């Protein structure tokens, strides 16, 4: 699978300040805190933030960044996405992929006929869902596990799920 190495991947969003010393609450989009810590430096709207400390919290994680030293600075980050370039993510085995790599791939039916482009991956609790936009800009969703066959440069969608 060919991935855009400079594409920014959001790993967490700052949800607010925690305390008065500049710590922030994070809503993580990864389950692995150790892997999150390993990135070390994140981009926040183009500004680098260096992770000093990370700990679990009932509402997600609490983080301290070297550049943020008081509550006002922490509050100013509310809603900010913490990103890393796609190339910073670890390589995966040949039969695995990151969902971000699926976005933008052309989607075809089993005969190879174009049906649209993948535009999003969602999870509403029952499994991962791929959203596809047709040429007429109408969108439909298919369950990834049952309906999508992933190839390096396109996705094959099972006929039963095509609208």
Swiss-Prot record:
Keywords: Chaperone, Cytoplasm, Ribosome biogenesis, rRNA processing. It is found in: Cytoplasm. Residues 94-162 form the PRC barrel domain. GO terms for cellular component: cytoplasm; ribosome. Its main location: cytoplasm. InterPro entries: PRC_barrel-like_sf, PRC_RimM, RimM, RimM_N, RimM_N_sf, Transl_B-barrel_sf. Gene3D superfamilies: PRC-barrel domain, RimM. GO terms for biological process: ribosomal small subunit biogenesis; rRNA processing. One of its GO terms (molecular function) is ribosome binding. It comes from the Bacteria. The keyword Manganese does not apply. Belongs to the RimM family. The PRC barrel domain binds ribosomal protein uS19. Binds ribosomal protein uS19. An accessory protein needed during the final step in the assembly of 30S ribosomal subunit, possibly for assembly of the head region. Essential for efficient processing of 16S rRNA. May be needed both before and after RbfA during the maturation of 16S rRNA. It has affinity for free ribosomal 30S subunits but not for 70S ribosomes. HAMAP family: Ribosome_mat_RimM. This is Ribosome maturation factor RimM. It comes from Zymomonas mobilis subsp. mobilis (strain ATCC 31821 / ZM4 / CP4).
